[in-house]
């Protein structure tokens, strides 16, 4: 199978086009320009708000003018993650895609099908005048991945739809009617620089090979957290020897489970062999604990050139203990919906910043607002006990399920008629923009669905090609059977 043969042709044509357009979160200017040019080319009414959200309108096909107005919605930014051995500049370089069996993936980077395949689907519908639909509005939001900025900034009156179809879900055959809310918690330690005494062995220890994944959609899988694994080893060494921590770096994005982390440390020269011995023991322990979920886990130890400066040992002790105590993973399962994670937390990144700051970013999610806040307060308490300064982000609301939704009824009936099996109606632990849309447009009737993606927010992201055509057929059938205006 070659890329030119992929079906539906229009969807994959536009997906390949937008893979050529750099679109990191908060840097979507080129994608906004692309959408404005697309609207002009097709003589479609196009407008852009102050945040950068783009709305392209398309009139109803003849005879469908009496249907309710549908908003198709996707976000235009993508998570930019790459393997350490890959040279790629997300600000300038296109995404290099390839076919692997029935899957489409990128070479060593995130694919951007989250949510590029939704964007491409909307463009294919806008460009094809043979598709039957009522009044249509295509909403393209900015910065979903790192702050839901576009959804927060959306103003009343920017769109006029009655129904919103969010195209940002990742399991074909599943229709989502609710999602978790979330909040970010950031802890900062201020450290002093100290000199490392003479006669110390310097080494770098690195955790890599983990799967990572989405901190909402994959948190229940029990995958390894590179920050937690690295900290376990550092804490072990600090308990055995006089440890100086010179550098620490782990994870990247608040909504991605960290795949890689490293630290550069120093211990007395006579402890050199013990470090290697203990790493071998620790590696065996980690492999035993995570053999099923993380078969490619690697811990690598290398000697380092001596450094003069390290983090003061008081801060190092408080940092390591806080990272050890900080929760990560599923905290509670839903008592209403079997199999749904209710509350979770992600220990996302540990970074050294200017002005002697070590910043730890975490994110908490829950379908219950009070439980979300309780989890954030738990994380705050851990880091405050260790002497860190903790701040919260703005947070975003969840989306409460409406099992009596009219468009849900249409979508469920359509799927059964097209494919002979029932679609699964579910809520999702990941955050979607839908909760924020309801704040501004409380009468919107919404569902979310999409083709099958795996490994999102990591270089393992891939899209199951046959599910794109099923998703396409389902979407077009829904558009043809939208309820009439009331």
Regions picked out by a protein language model, each given a short descriptive name:
Residues 22, 102-105, 145, 152-365:
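Midchain, well-structured core segments that form catalytic/ion-binding scaffolds
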Residues 7-11, 335, 342-355, 363, ...:
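Zn-dependent metallopeptidase/amidohydrolase metal-coordination segment
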Residues 36, 157, 223-240, 269-272, ...:
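His/Asp/Glu-rich mid-to-C-terminal helical/loop segments that flank catalytic regions of hydrolases
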Residues 76-78, 139-147, 169-172, 211, ...:
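Acidic, glycine-rich active-site loops and adjacent beta-strand->loop/helix elements
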Residues 65-66, 269-278, 369-375:
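Short, conserved charged micro-motifs
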Residues 64-146, 151-162, 202, 313-316, ...:
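Active-site metal-coordination/substrate-binding segment of hydrolases
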Residues 2-103:
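Acidic/His- and Gly-rich active-site-bordering loop/insert found
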Residues 340-430:
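Substrate-recognition/cap regions that form aromatic- and gly/pro-loop-enriched pockets
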């Amino acid at each position: 199978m070659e890329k030119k043969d992929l079906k539906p042709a229009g969807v994959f044509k536009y997906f390949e086009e937008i893979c050529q357009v750099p679109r990191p979160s908060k840097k979507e200017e080129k994608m906004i320009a692309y959408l404005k040019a697309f609207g002009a080319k097709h003589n479609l009414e196009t407008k852009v708000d102050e945040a950068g959200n783009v709305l392209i309108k398309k009139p109803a096909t003849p005879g469908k003018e009496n249907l309710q107005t549908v908003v198709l919605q996707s976000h235009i930014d993508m998570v930019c993650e790459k393997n350490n051995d890959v040279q790629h500049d997300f600000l300038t370089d296109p995404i290099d895609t390839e076919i692997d069996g029935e899957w489409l993936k990128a070479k060593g980077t995130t694919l951007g099908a989250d949510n590029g395949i939704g964007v491409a689907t909307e463009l294919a519908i806008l460009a094809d005048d043979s598709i039957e639909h009522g009044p249509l509005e295509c909403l393209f939001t900015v910065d979903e991945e790192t702050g839901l900025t576009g959804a927060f900034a959306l103003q009343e009156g920017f769109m006029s739809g009655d129904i919103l179809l969010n195209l940002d879900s990742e399991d074909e055959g599943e229709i989502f009617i609710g999602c978790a809310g979330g909040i970010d918690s950031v802890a900062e330690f201020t450290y002093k620089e100290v000199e490392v005494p003479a006669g110390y062995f310097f080494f770098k220890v690195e955790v890599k090979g983990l799967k990572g994944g989405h901190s909402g959609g994959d948190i229940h899988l029990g995958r390894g957290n590179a920050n937690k694994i690295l900290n376990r080893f550092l804490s072990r060494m600090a308990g055995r020897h006089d440890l100086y921590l010179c550098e620490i770096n782990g994870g990247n994005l608040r909504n991605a489970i960290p795949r890689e982390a490293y630290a550069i440390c120093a211990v007395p020269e006579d402890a050199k062999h013990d470090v290697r011995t203990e790493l071998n023991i620790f590696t065996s322990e980690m492999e035993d604990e995570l053999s099923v979920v993380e078969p490619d886990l690697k811990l690598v130890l290398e000697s380092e050139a001596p450094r003069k400066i390290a983090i003061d040992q008081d801060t190092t002790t408080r940092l390591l203990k806080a990272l050890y105590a900080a929760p990560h993973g599923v905290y509670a399962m839903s008592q209403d919906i079997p199999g749904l994670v209710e509350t979770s937390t992600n220990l996302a990144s540990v970074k050294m910043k200017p002005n002697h700051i070590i910043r730890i970013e975490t994110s908490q999610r829950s379908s219950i607002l009070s439980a979300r806040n309780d989890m954030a307060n738990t994380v705050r308490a851990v880091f405050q006990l260790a002497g860190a300064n903790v701040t919260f982000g703005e947070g975003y609301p969840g989306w409460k399920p409406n099992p009596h939704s009219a468009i849900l009824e249409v979508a469920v009936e359509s799927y059964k008629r097209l494919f002979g099996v029932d679609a699964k109606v579910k809520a999702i632990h990941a955050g979607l923009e839908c909760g924020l849309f309801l704040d501004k447009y409380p009468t919107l009737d919404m569902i979310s669905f999409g083709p099958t993606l795996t490994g999102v927010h990591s270089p393992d992201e891939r899209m199951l090609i046959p599910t794109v055509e099923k998703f396409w057929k389902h979407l077009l059938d829904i558009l043809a059977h939208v309820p009439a205006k009331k």
